[in-house]
Amino acid sequence: LRVCNIAIKAGEEILKYYNDDIDVTHKDDSSPLTKADLASNKIIIDNLKNLDSSIPILSEESLITWNERKNWNKYWLVDPLDGTKEFINRNGEFAVNIALLRDGKPVFGLIASPEQKLMYVGGTETGIFKIEFDSIENPTKWETISDPTEINDPIVMTCSRSHHSGPVIHFINDLKKISPTVEFAKKGSSLKFFDLASGAADAYPRFAPTMEWDIAAGQAILEALGGSVVHAETGLPLCYNKENLTNPYFIAKIKPLLALSS
């Protein structure tokens, strides 16, 4: 619950900037950065340290050198504002991501949508919860999420709003072997995992660059629901705390689709 409150507090801070003029700068890799990213980051870092100062924190906006983190066995992995471009475009499709990693695996994940006032949170040890909230003081609805039991008809693939690459077309053709028709749910940021967790979508292929903090929380949530997030070529689960924090291309599937496509 305390981590949920941290995410809600960060989201409230993000919305203060969302409803004002958005001042954008750019990082060394040309990706956008706003004051909302930094304000959310400070809230999350400070509060996670207060929660347990013994657990180190790796955040998109507070990077740690490889030498310092290479022996970490347990740590927080944070994206204080996932979907900065969506935030700048004011389409509501941005999120706060917080994950707890243990021995290179995400064991707890939280994805919160400040705009929707909705979060999915949990892991294999706790189960997954869907929480609707008005404020820190008022979580209005808690709901335990069960494993999806069947795929959609037709199959639904959640994806980014960008152009479909060749590998994505190939993946769609594989899905058509299961269902003749494939529908698309285009969405920004880690909110794609909302669609997977709720059963509104069946698969999420990603053949474009992402970073570890973009995916860890979603992987923890999806795996707790019997699904998977695997390397697109090897089929192995994604690894974390690599020297290079860029993810390989990956494919995420809900549990019933795994059974049909294995």
Regions inferred by a protein language model and the residue ranges of each:
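Residue-level signal for inorganic ion chemistry
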Residues: 10, 14, 37, 48, ...
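Glycine-rich active-site/cofactor-binding loop and its immediate structural neighborhood
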Residues: 72-111
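Oxyanion/phosphate-interacting regions
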Residues: 1-5, 11-12, 169-178, 192-262
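Acidic beta-strand-loop-alpha-helix segment within the catalytic core
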Residues: 98-193, 238, 242-262
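N-terminal subdomain of lithium-sensitive/metallo-dependent phosphomonoesterases centered on the IMPase/IPPase/PAP
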Residues: 1-81, 136, 170-173, 234-236
